[in-house]
Design a protein with these regions (language model features):
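N-terminal catalytic or cofactor-binding beta/alpha core of small enzyme domains
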Residues: 1-224, 241-242, 255, 264, ...
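Active-site-adjacent mobile loop/cap segments within catalytic or ligand-binding domains
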Residues: 226-279
Length: 292
């Protein structure tokens, strides 16, 4: 994964690459998913902090931090609300393969830049507040996806009903079956039942509130819902956990209102959330460098 606020060889700051995703519709009552409408409306680069935005900062909010350019890499299509789709897509997003968003650069090395931070966006119910999720869950996905399918994976304890495999005298048959068993082993076997973002969620919330209109209801949530929102979040957290990488990812739940006004509000809040995430990580890196 790229380094936050690292420098190029010429001394200039490298841009911070932030992956953004949104979901496709999944309910008859909500034929338009505001998470995707917000995501696709975002610019390619995070705009500079405007003076009028800065005036919304309360006295309890952390001061703005000088940050390098921030490139927003929005996934080019809404993600289907389907377990298999998400299962296959998430590793490609983080590892720069397949459908990973392109930076649009001409150089080959710029086509699939490494992701420094990620923000998955999903729709909640008809509520008026916006919430960032602290944790994702490994199990409990009992609802059908948009295609009427259940999550086909089984928890680890169900996969290990019998560890003793038959073995022929020459050992070849047993070796083959052992190999097949390992291939079929649950992808999340051995992982914690909950994984938390490595971002300082409280600090991100303070900064997000500081950059946003004071009347907006912005919160931290402890339960992403154990549906596709939770599933994609845990998928990212688990992929990074297994790779030994910093879990620099958050999930944002937005209201279900997909009106033009609501999408415009959501767009601005997402931009300020990304700013808050980047500021928090840049400040953390600075503290680490000076040994605070």
């Amino acid at each position: 994964m790229g380094s936050i606020a690292a420098s190029d060889r010429d001394g200039s700051e490298k841009p911070i690459n932030v992956l953004i995703t949104g979901f496709a519709p999944f309910k008859r009552d909500y034929p338009v998913n505001p998470s995707w409408e917000i995501a696709r409306s975002l610019p390619d680069w995070l705009p500079p902090l405007r003076a009028k935005t800065a005036t919304t900062t309360s006295t309890s909010s952390p001061p703005p931090v000088e940050i390098p350019p921030v490139r927003l890499l929005t996934h080019p299509a809404p993600i289907r609300v389907n377990y298999k789709t998400v299962r296959a897509l998430v590793p490609r997003l983080w590892d720069g393969d397949g459908d990973a968003p392109s930076s649009g650069g001409e150089k080959e090395e710029d086509k699939r830049p490494q992701i420094d931070l990620a923000l998955h966006i999903g729709m909640a119910g008809p509520r008026l507040f916006y919430s960032i999720e602290r944790r994702g869950h490994r199990e409990g996905y009992k609802m059908q996806d948009v295609d009427g399918e259940y999550l086909s994976d089984r928890p680890e304890e169900e996969e290990e009903e019998d560890d003793d495999l038959p073995e022929e005298e020459d050992g070849e048959r047993g070796g083959e079956e052992e190999g097949e068993r390992r291939k079929k082993r649950w992808i999340w076997a051995g992982l914690p039942k909950e994984l938390l973002s490595d971002l300082d969620v409280e600090d991100v919330l303070r900064r997000w509130r500081g950059h946003s209109p004071k009347h907006m209801d912005l919160r931290i949530s402890e339960d992403a819902g154990r549906y596709l929102c939770d599933f994609i979040y845990f998928s990212s957290l688990a992929h990074l956990y297994k790779a030994g990488r910093r879990r620099s990812v958050l999930f944002l739940h937005v209201p279900s209102d997909a009106s033009e006004h609501s999408v415009a509000v959501g767009r601005e809040l997402v931009l300020q959330l990304v700013r808050a995430m980047v500021e928090s990580e840049v400040e953390r890196r600075r503290r680490d460098e000076v040994g605070e």
